[in-house]
């Protein structure tokens, strides 16, 4: 009679121990479920942050490309305007040179028909000839200078067009690189998601809690090691590559203009205004001063 009672007491004790063990396991499972939910929430938050960063990066790249296109168009328009101004100035100089030659011929004919003393006439003709030669040399130098400036401006416009073409090519390369970076990030996330498959083999109940905690800790450690530094370095590398590819066309667009400004500062603006009408009229007045003296002496008609 005592042996069945002892067995009953033992069974009741085992039942109480089983219930306590069951309660402990249920609490452990609830804790693991809460931790899993928090990890899932963090993962969703990180994915949302990554999507927002990708949207901001795409918006910034579009804005930078638009500004670069507008700046290139403005530089091309300025170069065309300078070329047109140089061409117009050259035509004005040629027309003024023709007028001076006509005046010289008219004055020569007047001196020939309205003679005076032979010596004074020869001296006046010699002075006028020397001044005309000097003026023609000056005009030739001015024409050569303006032709060189026009050639420099044409070369600058050509460099600008070449830089714009290279910028368009690099924009295509940039888009391809962005697609490859997104594909690599998706592949990395897929490999991380499928790298640890569930093990279908049964495990003892005593080792379940320890193995689950070890797996969660190992996953968190791997995520901190690879997900923090690897993804960050990949994003930093992609951003540096984007900045480099966007700044290269800007460098190609600015270098020709800097070269023209530093190497030949008189090729823009002041070079076009250095030969003004005042200097030309002063030289013309100096050239015609002997004729005015002849007119004052009464050797030329009024």
From Swiss-Prot:
- Compartments (UniProt record): Membrane
Gene it is expressed from: Tmem191
Q: Which GO terms describe its cellular component?
A: membrane
Q: Which organism is it from?
A: Mus musculus (Mouse)
TM stretches of this protein: 242-262
Region Disordered, as annotated, extends over 39-66
Q: Which domain of life is it from?
A: Eukaryota
Protein name in the entry: Transmembrane protein 191
Alphabetical UniProt keywords: Coiled coil, Membrane, Transmembrane, Transmembrane helix
Coiled-coil ranges per the record? 5-147
Bilayer topology: Single-pass membrane protein
Q: Where is the composition biased (Basic and acidic residues)?
A: 42-53
Q: Which Pfam families match?
A: TMEM191C
Which family does the similarity line name?
Belongs to the TMEM191 family.
Its chief place of residence is membrane
């Amino acid at each position: 009679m005592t042996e069945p009672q002892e067995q009953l007491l033992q069974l009741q004790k085992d039942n109480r121990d089983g219930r306590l063990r069951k309660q402990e396991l249920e609490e452990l499972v609830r804790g693991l479920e809460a931790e899993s939910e928090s990890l899932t929430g963090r993962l969703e938050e990180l994915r949302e942050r990554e999507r927002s960063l990708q949207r901001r990066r795409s918006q910034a790249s579009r804005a930078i490309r638009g500004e670069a296109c507008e700046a290139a168009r403005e530089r091309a328009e300025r170069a065309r305007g300078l070329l047109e101004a140089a061409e117009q100035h050259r035509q004005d100089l040629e027309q003024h040179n023709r007028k001076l030659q006509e005046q010289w011929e008219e004055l020569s004919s007047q001196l020939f028909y309205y003679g005076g003393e032979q010596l004074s006439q020869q001296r006046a003709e010699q002075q006028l000839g020397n001044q005309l030669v000097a003026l023609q040399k000056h005009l030739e130098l001015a024409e050569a200078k303006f032709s060189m400036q026009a050639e420099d401006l044409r070369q600058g416009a050509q460099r600008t067009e070449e830089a714009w073409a290279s910028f368009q090519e690099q924009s295509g390369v940039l888009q391809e690189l962005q697609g490859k970076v997104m594909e690599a990030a998706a592949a990395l996330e897929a490999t991380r998601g499928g790298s640890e498959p569930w093990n279908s083999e049964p495990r003892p109940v005593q080792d379940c809690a320890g193995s689950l905690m070890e797996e969660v800790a190992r996953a968190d450690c791997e995520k901190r090691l690879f997900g923090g530094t690897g993804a960050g370095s990949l994003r930093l590398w992609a951003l540096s590559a984007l900045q480099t590819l966007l700044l290269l066309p800007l460098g190609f667009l600015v270098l020709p203009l800097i070269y023209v400004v530093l190497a030949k500062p008189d090729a823009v603006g002041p070079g076009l205004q250095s030969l003004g009408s005042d200097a030309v009229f002063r030289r013309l007045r100096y050239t015609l001063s002997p004729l005015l003296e002849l007119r004052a002496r009464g050797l030329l008609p009024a």
